Amino acid sequence: MAENSDLTSLEESFRKFAIYGDTKATGQEMTGKNWAKLCKDCKVIDGKSVTGTDVDIVFSKVKGKSARVITCEEFKKALEELSGKRFKGKSKEEAYEAICKLVVGKEPVSAGITKPAATGAVDRLTDTSKYTGSHKERFDESGKGKGKGGRETIVENTGYVSSYKLAGTYDAKVKK
């Protein structure tokens, strides 16, 4: 079986892939989508002996009947299941070691994510610190929008009479 340090780094890889793409994930359970991503990114899926379908079948085998996710222990069982198929000529232990080496230390790859373009006119139009006039009042120093408070002056209609506005200012006017 794998060494103790390999197991901890294997669990670390599990956690990284488990939280990928889900802001509410704790890292204790992995979805089928993230399991497939792990297998693809770590080159467990080679297209010949192990395909995406094989990965999905193994996921369904190791998870509970009504469960939609797998735990770290089930993840290790799933790797064991795939290791025999991925490395056919090796013994079970050697195949499991080899598949663990593929996964250990890997992180999810974010391919195809576009970066914002900050060139010429786009930079001037999107930089809120360069805004002038009433538009600069719409944003705070960090560039975050103020919402309706930045567009309109909000007056509270409070007081004894419906048309009396700006409650609490009468005393300031009388003292003059």
Curated annotation (Swiss-Prot):
Residues 126-152 are annotated as: Disordered. One of its GO terms (molecular function) is tubulin binding. GO terms for cellular component: cytoplasm; microtubule. The keyword Transferase does not apply. Its main location: cytoplasm. SUPFAM superfamilies: EF-hand. It holds the Pfam family p25-alpha. It comes from the Eukaryota. The keyword Cytoplasm applies. Keywords: Cytoplasm, Cytoskeleton, Microtubule. Residues 134-152 have a biased composition (Basic and acidic residues). It is found in: Cytoplasm; Cytoplasm, Cytoskeleton. Coiled coil: none annotated. Disulfide bonds: none annotated. GO terms for biological process: microtubule bundle formation; microtubule polymerization. Belongs to the TPPP family. Regulator of microtubule dynamic that has microtubule bundling activity. This is Tubulin polymerization-promoting protein family member 3. The gene is tppp3.
